């Protein structure tokens, strides 16, 4: 996976190197953001330092974790949520499939908190074959799996 940013436009190239001829393989790419701070309901004993009873804007009362930090928040899907179909001509032992994506990042997202997650999935069995995560601007080589 290779990515670069120009202004607020991110460009990503994802390569899928296959060791097996999957019948129905898909390639997906997500943009995630870390560090989003929002209140949320907390019905667990965790985070007692930020949890107390509170009132929502609609007047309802709840146990709220105030200022909870959300990480790995899905902000954009470059592909179909289940991944884009990799056509039969591109599937097979030792074949490499390449797909390029682009996205204009809205101003409400912090560039330094963004990361990419690419995955290869067997759509029929709903099975993730492999995945990679990287910051924008990083280049990663293939990661073989057995």
Regions found by a protein language model. Give the residues of each.
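Short, conserved sequence motifs used for protein processing/export or organelle targeting and
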Residues: 1-146
